[in-house]
Amino acid sequence: MRIIKIIALTLVMMLSLNGVASAESALNRILSTGVLKAGTTGDFPPFSKRDVTTNEYEGFDIDVLRELAKDMDVEIEFVPTDWKTLVNGIVAGNYDISGSASIQAKRMKAAGYSDTYMAVVIKAFTTEDKISRFDGWDSINKAGVKTATTLGTTFENLSKTWFPNSDLTLIEAPARGYQ
């Protein structure tokens, strides 16, 4: 069953908070043009991954966004973005919605959120030859320990807070930067 009211509420919450009229006009535009634009990074498997051979997106977020578009009886258009501008792209009108944006107070000042549809667990990882160096979070927070996380994500702020003594590198594009 198509529940347009719930979908409309979800879109209203994901659009910039410039007022109800703005959100309603965005919803009207989506329905009248027949296109829901979704910002995605394509570098966050298994949630959003761009297949370089076909240029198609796949993953859990992609499936959720496709189902939303299907329920709204509109087409989905994926718009490439990056983590540091994910929410800004919604505010700027580059796209209507996104997925996998963790809730942050700073982001909530600019954009709304739907109900949470997944939870993540934060894990540190390293190569097998270095495992013996680390017996907990405190052993990571030391000078000379190299850490890395993705620029513009919740993990950037957490890494800076949890590991201020480590040598932190910010990676702009995970698919390229962690290799």
Language model features with spans:
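Ligand-binding cleft/hinge of the Venus flytrap
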Residues: 48-54, 65-74, 136-141, 154-173
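Bacterial N-terminal signal peptides that target proteins for export
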Residues: 1-8
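Short Pro/Gly-enriched coil loops immediately N-terminal to beta-strands
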Residues: 112-126, 142, 161
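Sec/Tat signal peptide C-region and signal peptidase I cleavage site
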Residues: 18-23
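Extracytoplasmic small-molecule ligand-binding "clamshell" domains
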Residues: 24-101, 109
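Bacterial N-terminal signal peptides
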Residues: 8-16
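Ligand-binding "clamshell"
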Residues: 52, 106-120, 165
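Flexible hinge/capping segments at coil-to-helix
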Residues: 128-145
